[in-house]
Amino acid sequence: MSFLYKLRIIFIWPLLVITLLSTPKPVSTETAQLVSSETFVFDQALIMGQGITNDGEYFYTSGTVTGINSTAIAKFRVGSMDFVDSNFNPLPKVCTDRGNNHIGGISYYNGKIYAPVEGGDEVYACIVVFDAETLEATGEVYDLPNNLYPSGVPWCAVDPETGYLYASIWKSTKVIHVYDTNDSMKHIGDINLKTPISHIQGAEFLDGTLYMSQDTRNKGSIRDILKVDFESGEVSVVAERDIVNEDYEAEGMTFTKGDGGAILHVLDYNKLIGINVNSYKADF
């Protein structure tokens, strides 16, 4: 048994036990039936505190701790959440040289992980692409115009049916920008919304529809899952998740499919302890 593994047992497992005993668990609501909740602490929390996506076999997560200038991309097995691999501080030099230090809500498409990246004095919002097998950056870095992303880019989601990538700013906006991943991230249009969205932490497509994880704090411990109708521009709340503790931060989300239907997985961040991966029936 290695020295580092012994340290992990000595320090992490007691922390995990304390967390499990003291942390209130999320509960089901009329619109969000909880299936399971798993807690990850310390080193694993560092690599999964922002975004989550999957390819059916693996979950891919992103982590950012700006206080210690740490970023990460990681891989876990779908079904068991067993750790597979991670890449600490994976951003390419062109990003780190200009101060990029934040990876947001990520999205998987066609063997690649698309990551929204921001940070630095001039924000420098961009999409960085990683190889899903190796977790290494592919060298593809697509800068986004500062006039469209003055406050950065917190999330992106790729429609697996078209290869189009969708993204918006963090603050209140009525526009979602659309890019073609198969054409050098060309900006091909916008989705104009009837009502503004804000504080979107992650998003994913399910059967051609875009769903988003929102972290507004105006409903106590309730965190909303939104649905966007591209044709009408309507934005609606399809699930109200009760994460019990109003100080927790809702982060990224993804869907998996099985014989029993689709399951929604959402990251909820307790910054004092770690990450909860909360899973719900996607009956919407």
Where are these regions (language model features)?
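Surface loop/turn motifs at the tips and blade-to-blade linkers of beta-strand repeat domains
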Residues: F40-A45, F88-P90, V94-R98, Y142-P150, ...
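Beta-strand-rich domains and repeat architectures in extracellular enzymes and scaffolds
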Residues: V41-T71, H102
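Repeated scaffold domains used in trafficking and secretory/extracellular systems
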Residues: L46-T53, T96-G105, N147-V158, P196-E204, ...
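Short coil/turn segments that connect the beta-strands within blades of beta-propeller domains
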Residues: G56-E57, N110-G111, E161-G163, D207-T209, ...
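Beta-propeller domains
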Residues: Y60-P90
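Structural motif
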Residues: I68-K75, E122-V129, T173-Y179, K219-K227, ...
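Blade-loop segments of beta-propeller domains
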Residues: M81-N110, Y114
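Loop/turn-rich, solvent-exposed surfaces of beta-rich toroidal or solenoidal domains
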Residues: T195-F230
